[in-house]
Amino acid sequence: WKPHNYQIELNNKLSNLNSALVIAPTGGGKTLAGFIPPIADIIKEAPKGLHTLYISPLKALANDIERNLESPIKEMELDITLETRTGDTKQSKRTSQKLNPPNFLMTTPESFILMLSWETSKKFFSNLKFLIIDEIHTLFNDKRGDLLSLGISELRNINSHFKKIGLSATVSDPKTILFWLNSGDNLNHNSTIIQQPKFLNPNIDIPKTKRNIPWSGHSGIYALNDILNIISQNKTTIIFVNTRAQSEILFQEIWKINEENFTIALHHGSLSKEQRLRVESEMSKGHLKAVIATSSLDLGIDWNSVDHIINLGAPKGVNRLIQRIGRSGHSYNRVSRASLIPTNKFELLECHAAVNLVNKEHLDKIDYSDGALEVLAQFLVGLSLSAPLDPDLTYRIVK
């Protein structure tokens, strides 16, 4: 393995900066880039307690990052502890983490906000050196992002010394995301954007089907044989759908015609923790032929065996489509391959438009809006649990 130029650039520049936004295509190694500065720092100083907080929009991604970091840390014989804390974490583990935090903690925005509500939150975060926000482009402009932004502002109130690293896929306006990353800091002058050149364009097709595409409906049942044919021709395929109900129906219908007994699994947020973790583990080992998934597997998962993506239904935005396509060929300079299968004739038009926009590298416009008031109310309730509210200080945190 050899580090890419932009990964080295981040490590060299961040020592003199307060924050950095890394823009890189899917599979470009941006998550590893984000961890290089913390690892280099912890080798020099060997601190105790929480050193680096990594925030991911998905539980599956947080789990995947922990697995991917364990191996190199062991190989380099580094004395670094790393753990994951999400809604799936056992209560005994959560208690242990609260009393004896690991050096690297992988978590989600919701779990991070809950940690800030502890009476011991100031002590817990007092020595934090790095905050990494992965897939920041999916968080910065929705209610989860509003809550996360408030949490980061409170974290800056607790500890003014940590550095922030934002990791993002290619977007149309990186400066807007950098502004969000630095909101509340007044440190924009001491930050940078590091951009990795884009890869080869993905290979996307809309398969011709022998059956007529229906005028209405969203099941995609007419294309079952086409889907199974694509699965048979590839090592591992992820079939993305837009709803959990759609994933359940498709899974059952595929099994009815799965005469070759391909190992096909299902993954969505309503499944039990044990079921989801088992699917993720089997995928990481390359044991599954296909997985039918919702947005629960949209982001960042590093499964090298995946060589094809099927998006069933119209893509909900160009950026999201590129993100999903990037699950295939998820490594440096491999071409991602995908098939778009519309569920009705109107979606056929949307699919053709989406392919055209991807080929022209026309990304979705980024809109930046004011935060939601209900999110502010939720944040204030959590903040009041950690300590009595000081009106002036609370105003500065929120502002």
Q: What name fits each language-model region?
A:
Residues 2-113, 117-386, 391-399:
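Helicase motor core with emphasis on the C-terminal RecA-like subdomain
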